[in-house]
Each structure stands twice: as C-alpha cells, then as structure tokens.
C-alpha cells in the first residue's frame, strides 16, 4: 500500500464522540498517522510484527498497522468510550485489532501486553498535565525494542535526556498536527502544531 492510499484509507476513521480535555483527546489526523505508519513499514517494523498502540484513542494508528500487515495488533486506552469508537472503526475497515481498556500506569499492563516488536503512539503532549507523556514512554520502552511516537516539535532533546540510559533516538521526522476547535478554551478554528515523529531504539 502506497502512502497516499494509506492516508485515504485512514481518512474516514471517526474521531472522539465526547472528547475529554483532561486526556488531551485529539484525533490523530490521517496524513500524520499515515506518515508515521508508512515510515515504520519501510523500516520493517510493521509487516509480520506484533504491534502495540498505547493511548490508541479511536484507533487510527492501530487500525493502520493492521491494514499494513502486522501479525498482531494490541491497542490500549483508558477511556471506554474511545475504545468503543475504535472497535467500531476497526470493524468498518475489517481490521483485526485487540483493544484493551486500561491505564498505561497500571502495573499489571506490561504483563497483560506481554512483549511486542513495535510500539506506535501519540501520547498526550502535557498541555493539561505536565509530563503526561512519561508513563507512555516508560511502558513503551519496557515492552518493545522499537518505538515510534509523536511529540511536540523541539521535544527530542528532552526525550534524549529522559531516556538516555534506556534508548537512543534513531530518527526524527517533522510533521504538522492541525487541531480543530474542540474545547471552550480554543480560540482558533484550526491551529497547526509542529510535531516530530521519533523512532526510539531500546538499548540492550
């Protein structure tokens, strides 16, 4: 599947019915999701692999991984309503994904997920709660040797420092995350946020 075809396939995926600001629930746009997934595919980290999506929301990354030939896809989110929507989205595209309602901070989750080959995720940026992305990073590095994650542009140095003993940043790809007016505190119809996709390789 080519990048443009992947983007078009992911475009109809529905976002949150009742987004929650505290969880920074913004639908990952299809172009950005496709870019992350296609990059991972080209690196050999999707097809035939066991893939985990942490903080899956309504499932765009997990569903995309399944459509790109992942052997097994497991996706986690703490919001039952989001997972309900993700299940519906997966069914509509005939994508097989195992969705789990759980908090990434749950000590039992690593055992439940077991190990996987690749983590894909778009964690909270920390706009509502500082360092909200850290539990996602910690879990990702504990269960997979390779992680692809979307962060605010300029986060690479912090991530490099935070994960210095555990992982190294292998690649960085820039992108744009258009955030539509969703909550009462938004002042623009659309605000384009510069982001970066980081590929983290766990140290042996």
Residue ranges: model-predicted function:
Residues 1-204:
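Class I S-adenosyl-L-methionine-dependent methyltransferase catalytic core
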